[in-house]
C-alpha cells in the first residue's frame, strides 16, 4: 500500500478538496408544457416522457 513520504499541509489539503464538488444538474425544457425538467426523467408538471403520457398528473 502506498504511504505519503511527507506531511501534506492544510493549505494543500484544502486546495485539493475545494475542487471536489457536486455538479449542477442539467435542466431542459419539456417538449409539451415547456416547464424545466431533468433530462431522461418524466416531466413532473405534465407527466410526459419521450412524447408519451407516462404519469397521471
UniProtKB/Swiss-Prot annotation:
Q: Name one GO biological process term.
A: translation
* Gene Ontology MF, one: structural constituent of ribosome
Q: Which domain of life is it from?
A: Bacteria
| Annotated InterPro entries | Ribosomal_bL32 (IPR002677), Ribosomal_bL32_bact (IPR044957), Ribosomal_zn-bd (IPR011332)
Which UniProt keywords are given for this protein, alphabetically ordered?
Answer: Ribonucleoprotein, Ribosomal protein
> Which cysteine pairs are covalently linked by disulfides here?
none
Q: Does the keyword Zinc apply?
A: no
What cellular-component terms does GO give this entry?
large ribosomal subunit
The record, for PANTHER family, names: 50S RIBOSOMAL PROTEIN L32, LARGE RIBOSOMAL SUBUNIT PROTEIN BL32
> What family does the database annotate?
Belongs to the bacterial ribosomal protein bL32 family.
NCBIfam families, per database record: rpmF_bact
Name of the protein in question? Large ribosomal subunit protein bL32A
**What organism does the UniProt record list as the source?**
Streptomyces coelicolor (strain ATCC BAA-471 / A3(2) / M145)
Corresponding gene?
A: rpmF1
Amino acid at each position: 500500500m502506498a504511504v505519503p513520504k511527507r506531511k501534506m499541509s492544510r493549505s494543500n489539503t484544502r486546495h485539493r478538496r475545494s475542487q471536489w464538488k457536486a455538479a449542477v444538474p442539467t435542466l431542459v425544457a419539456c417538449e409539451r408544457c415547456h416547464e424545466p425538467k431533468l433530462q431522461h426523467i418524466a416531466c413532473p408538471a405534465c407527466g410526459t416522457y419521450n412524447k408519451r403520457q407516462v404519469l397521471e398528473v
